[in-house]
Amino acid sequence: MTGTQAQSSDNAQQPDGLIIAAETRRMIWNAVAVDGDRVFVAGPRWAGVNGPAIALIDGKDGLIPYPDASWNAWQPGSDVTKTFVNVNAIRRDDHNGLWVIDTGSPTFGGDPLPGAAKAVRIDLATNRIGRIYPLGPRVALPGSYVDDIRFHGDHAYLTDAGRAGLIVLDLRSGEARRVLDGAPSVTAPTGRPIVMDGEIVRMPDGSPLRVNSDPLEVSPDGRYLYFGSLHGPWSRIETRLLDDPGISASELASNVEAWADLPPVGGTAMAPDGTLYFTDLANEALKKRAPDGTITTVVQYPGLHWVDAPALAGGFIWLPVPQLDRLPLFHKGTSKVVWPIRLYRYKLDAQAN
């Protein structure tokens, strides 16, 4: 990895402490996970690059497919149960595991291939697949885009950014079920567009890009799951209610509470003290929301253009910058990506260690 000070293509003055940890021309990474001195990155197939789906960073710009080459070698006709079709998120748990969220669809907005949507846990001690959790057709629906994951006890919670809803996964039994399907709390609202470089991000048909249930965090005490569409606002619900399959859909919906009115965010990370770090897309900034609701800017810089899912590790916050809005999909087939793709890290206060 490199450790150089950040410098933007528009020659903006780089903030003190913002370090380029790695850069590449082979991947458009939107996710990062850190295990000691090992740094993993991942990116979606629909971004249109030929690098691995998940990689271990080796040196300044080397990328080693992880956990091996075969899992990163999906092609049409491949066994979708033993390859990564489209990785949208990676997440390190508290038990030496690296979780991989595979949407199962090689195209943006497409339906998951049969049997392809899954959550995969890799044992970081052995670098081998520990367990595969299939997300079957009753969970990953046509149009689903299983987005991200968080944990509490024997359960995991996932967001579906395509077919608005949450997924509750029993880590012991492997059973998964959908909750809050189509509820307002998980549905992208109108009137809160994603704005980058002063313009609304639009789909090829000209309609504004709308991303349903996307970011989520579990409170440090495990009591609440915080969640929302990418556009905001955020809601919360008690995890004990989500964990109970006997709770009715109407009772769950009635227990959703408003939590925080945040702008469109690329990604979030929650510190042990309850501080929520989030990337403010429109302002190319990393901000934080204190437990009392106060919001302040941590660092702002043009190079932080669409920072996606950050990670807290070793006193740093790691910031992958995929520049998703600059992909050809959103510009009539023309790429606006400014190469190389970068991963930054920024030193935080002690409470984020």
Indicate residue ranges for each PLM-predicted region.
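Blade-loop segments of beta-propeller domains
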Residues: K60-W99, T103-T107, P112, R131-V139
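Beta-propeller fold detector
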Residues: L63-A73, G130-P134, R177-R192, D244-A260, ...
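Short loop/turn segments immediately following beta-strands, especially the blade-tip
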Residues: R172-A176, I237-S248, L348-A352
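Beta-propeller domains
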Residues: F40-A73, G109-D111, L124-A125
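Beta-rich, blade/repeat-based domains predominating
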Residues: R25-G36, S78-G97, I101, R138-Y157, ...
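Beta-strand-rich domains and repeat architectures in extracellular enzymes and scaffolds
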Residues: I19-P52
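Asp-box/WD-like beta-propeller blade repeats and closely related beta-sheet repeat scaffolds
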Residues: P106-H155, T159
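Conserved beta-strand positions in repeat-built beta-propeller and related beta-rich domains
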Residues: V41-G48, V100-G104, D111, L158-G162, ...
